[in-house]
Regions:
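Short, Lys/Arg-rich flexible segments
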Residues: 1-7, 90, 147
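Alpha-helical scaffold segments that mediate packing/assembly in large oligomeric complexes
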Residues: 64-143
Length: 217
């Protein structure tokens, strides 16, 4: 899987769902008088729910076919099945990054979908991937205190179209060693402009595709 090691893996889950708690930031208060009433700071807290899904894959191999073959096909079949498993993991992770999170803020309430805030969505603007868009994404992580200065790892998914956009942008391929390496190898994977770039050819969309940038935690 391209993405599995780049998120927090909860491992084996018992049951049809699991939850994760989230909490907003809190700040210190000034003490202006002695023996005054305690001022409580109530952070924004919530619970997010992840629903489990089932998938399977079965490929038949007739016993008569095995006898007719010099080589055992099961090794190749197994490798293709394992590759399908990894692709499905990536598809599920990508859909979760794009989709709404099920969240509630009190015990008696019900879970409802919470989409990514509009302020964290960079519009296509009729252009492909540009240096300006990458810098804007980088700025968002810094604004949200969710970059390497806070111990985070940042990733961005790219496909062949984005590869073409980046390699064709002279403002990105005319300066440093990484730019030279990009042009020599025709590849943009690795870390640059603050992101670790992850190849993924299943970005959704037709004329306009949607990629995602995220922090591991």
């Amino acid at each position: 899987s391209r993405f599995e090691s780049k998120i927090i893996n909860r491992g084996s889950i018992v049951g049809s769902s699991f939850t994760a708690n989230d909490m907003g930031t809190i700040e210190m208060n000034s003490v202006t008088n002695r023996y005054g009433d305690t001022e409580w700071s109530i952070p924004d807290v919530g619970v997010r729910q992840a629903l489990m899904s089932d998938y399977d894959l079965a490929v038949p191999v007739d016993q008569f076919d095995l006898l007719k073959l010099i080589a055992n096909p099961q090794g190749d079949y197994l490798q293709r099945c394992l590759a399908a498993v990894q692709r499905k993991k990536d598809a599920v992770i990508y859909a979760a990054l794009k989709g709404s999170a099920l969240r509630k803020t009190d015990e008696s309430g019900s879970f409802s979908g919470q989409a990514l805030p509009a302020g964290q969505v960079i519009a296509a603007g009729g252009t492909g991937m540009t240096k300006a868009k990458i810098i804007t994404a980088r700025k968002q992580f810094r604004t949200n205190e969710a970059d390497e200065h806070n111990g985070e790892e940042q990733y961005i998914a790219y496909d062949a179209g984005m590869l073409e956009d980046v390699l064709s942008d002279t403002t990105l391929t005319s300066a440093d060693f990484m730019a030279v390496k990009m042009l020599q190898e025709g590849d943009i994977s690795g870390k640059w402009l603050g992101f670790k770039w992850v190849p993924y050819e299943a970005l959704t969309g037709t004329s306009t595709k949607t990629t995602m940038a995220w922090a591991k935690t």
